Design a protein with these regions (language model features):
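Alpha-helical assembly-interface signal, strongest on the long, hydrophobic N-terminal helix that forms
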Residues: 1-62
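Short, conserved structural patches
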Residues: 2, 55, 59-133
Length: 133
C-alpha cells in the first residue's frame, strides 16, 4: 500500500504544528513546578524561623536561619506573643516569560507558630527584650 501524493509530508506538517504547543505546555508546567518548590521553601523557612525563636535563639539569628532556607529575595519576620512565636515568610516567583509573558509574578507565603520552649528570666527568648520584640 502506498500513500497518495497529496498525503506525503502530512506527518511532518502535523508535527510542526504540534511541537511548539508541546514546548509551551512543558514550559508552563516547569514554571508551575518552580512555584510549588518556592512554596515548599517558604513553608520550611517559616517553620525553621519559628523553631529557632521558640528554642530561645535571638530574633536576628532566627530570621537568618529562615533566610537560609527561603527563596532568594524573600522576607522573613518573627514575633512573640505571650507564650507563642509566630514566623512569616514570603517570596515571589517571576512569571515564566515567553508565550506566558502575560502571567504576573506569583507571591508565595507561609506562617508557622511554635510554643516557647523555655522562658528565661528576662521575660522572653534569649536575645529578645522583655515583653517581646
Amino acid at each position: 500500500m502506498s500513500r497518495s501524493s497529496d498525503e506525503s509530508g502530512a506527518a511532518t506538517a502535523e508535527l510542526a504544528m504540534a511541537l511548539p504547543l508541546l514546548v509551551a505546555v512543558t514550559a508552563g508546567l516547569v514554571w508551575l513546578l518552580a512555584v510549588g518548590a518556592a512554596q515548599v521553601r517558604v513553608v520550611d523557612a517559616a517553620r525553621e524561623t519559628a523553631r529557632a525563636a521558640a528554642r530561645g535563639d535571638g530574633a536576628d539569628e532566627a530570621v537568618a536561619r529562615g533566610l537560609q532556607v527561603a527563596p532568594e529575595g524573600s522576607r522573613v519576620t518573627v514575633a512573640v506573643s505571650g507564650d507563642r512565636v509566630r514566623a512569616s515568610a514570603a517570596g515571589r516567583v517571576a512569571g515564566p516569560g515567553g508565550l506566558f509573558d502575560f502571567l504576573p509574578a506569583v507571591t508565595v507565603h507561609a506562617e508557622a507558630v511554635a510554643a516557647l520552649e523555655a522562658i528565661p528570666a528576662s521575660g522572653g527568648p534569649a536575645g529578645w527584650p522583655a515583653g517581646g520584640p
